[in-house]
Amino acid sequence: HLLYAYCAERGVPHRRCGKLIVAASEAQRATLQQIRTKAAANGVDDLRWLDRAAVHALEPEVACVAALHSPSTGIIDSHALMLAYQGDAEDRGAMIAFHAPVTSGRITDDGIELEVAGHDPMRLCAQSVVNSAGLHAPAVAHAIEGLTPELIPTAYFAKGNYYTLSGARPFSHLVYPVPEQAGLGIHVTIDLGGQVRFGPDVEWIDAIDYDVDPGRAAGFYDAIRQYYPGLRDGAIEPGYAGIRPKIGPQGAQAADFVIQGPRDHGVAGLVNLFAIESPGLTAAQVLAQEVASALGHPVSRAA
């Protein structure tokens, strides 16, 4: 609700298209019920249970035995959102330094001293540092002298590939299968222009690589046809890839967001953000509230 209100206020393009989480087999019904129960415990009270006929009425191309319908789920112009956030920060006096990587740092009596590289290298002394470096957050934390290494999680990379659908859009809702261990499963995403993509899958990698392997298409067809049997051969092609900033290895239970503040590591003014994968963008404003609270700033927690 915070995000929708912000988008309406700032004119960020978005649309509440709704989402279906589908059980492709009877064995997955119990998992759907677990999702519903967990959602209710987290304050999500608008999920509706749909039987096969109700799903068919909403999305005739979707095959399943049951589904959860989330009417409040939507899509957004993520680039416009980030520009809006940047504009808000700069309006409040922030200076954004692009291509300025932090190479090292150390804890001092006066705060945190950072060595910053790039076009204009500098030494920066700060009272507060928020390490929100995504894939590189553990590496940045390790580069700060004085921070206990044992408190820094190991970084693991789980690549997520997307394939693009050619032809007419067969869905009006986002369609998600029952989640798998390391991700949300290969699901249907729709952008504001109507382009349909399927993904992401899970590909564990040792080094950062954003190329999409065309050879992964067979696995995509198999996964998508579990809930979209009408997908024709040759209808999808490689799109793009992202990489999840995991802090557990392949086979481990997925970790929740880690917001590590002074109470956790004992360094005043430092907050580390680890494992901020999807839905980190959706939760950005609430994450910011948590960071501010960890730094001792008063926070107004509007709903």
Q: Which residue stretches match the model-derived regions?
A:
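Dinucleotide-binding Rossmann-like beta1-alpha1 core, especially the glycine-rich loop
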Residues: 1-54, 58, 64, 185
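A general structural signal for well-ordered alpha-helical segments in protein cores
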Residues: 3, 29-35, 52, 82, ...
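Active-site substrate-recognition segment that forms the wall
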Residues: 10-14, 123-128, 132-266
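Short loop/edge segments at beta-strand edges and connector loops
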Residues: 16, 51-52, 98-100, 238-240
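A short, glycine/Asx- and small/polar-enriched loop/turn
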Residues: 27-31, 58-65, 106-113, 248-254, ...
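Short, conserved active-site loop motifs that form the nucleotide-linked donor/cofactor pocket
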Residues: 47, 93-95, 270
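Helical element adjacent to the flavin cofactor pocket in flavoenzyme catalytic cores
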Residues: 68-128, 285
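C-terminal lid/capping helical subdomain adjacent to the catalytic/cofactor pocket in oxidative enzymes
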Residues: 254-303
